[in-house]
Amino acid sequence: MKITKTELFLRLAKPNEQGISRWVKTSEFAGEYKDLKLGNGGSWCRKDSPLARDYIVEFDKGLTSGNSIDAIRLNGFNQEKHFKQYIRKDIKDALKTRNCVMLGVNGKSENTKIEIDHKDGRKNNHRVSDIKTQKLEDFQPLCKAANDVKRQICKTCKETNKRWSAKNISGNPYAFYMGDENYSEELGCVGCYQYDPVEYRKSSVKRIAAEAAKYTSDYIFKKLYEEDNG
């Protein structure tokens, strides 16, 4: 039975009872360990990987020139509570046949196939992390192309604490359906177009209707009772 890359690295690194290993050079990723070769940032050892959920993973980029990872070590067990990406099967089944809420597609090509997206891009709500307590409305169907873009937008928001404005899309009347560009713990991602484009559109219709009703009534009163205003 083929072992996972996490298991393969643990076999090579041999952490002790405290979860501490030696520095393992990436040049050692050869022969029976060749599957550990790092590509696209080293997905098996990223901070959201199974390895990083269990261990504190450290990198050394100073052995060679450039910004590539030269060595990896484990520096103890990770005691932090980590967000689990698992999505309950009934939720997946309910959403996988729907069209992308941003682009309206559900295809078979790489960029049009549906992925089930965690609406909250920060993924720090442990209720959503728990398959026993997560809800259908915590997720949305996005095609891969839309999900890839959203992921980068959420990454920028996390780095800057500035939320993405829906007015970046021509024709969108409001920047947010709740809150403003400043990320807050109170609202989190709620109010951002990327969090819920369907709710954004519903909210926009209600706001426009309310504004139109107000302006219409003001216009009628001014027209009928112009003398009273004079």
Curated annotation (Swiss-Prot):
Single GO MF annotation: type II site-specific deoxyribonuclease activity
Signal peptide residue numbers: none
The entry's keywords: Endonuclease, Hydrolase, Nuclease, Restriction system
Reactions catalysed: Endonucleolytic cleavage of DNA to give specific double-stranded fragments with terminal 5'-phosphates
UniProt feature coiled coil, ranges: none
Single Gene Ontology BP annotation: DNA restriction-modification system
The protein's name in its UniProt record: Type II restriction enzyme NlaIII
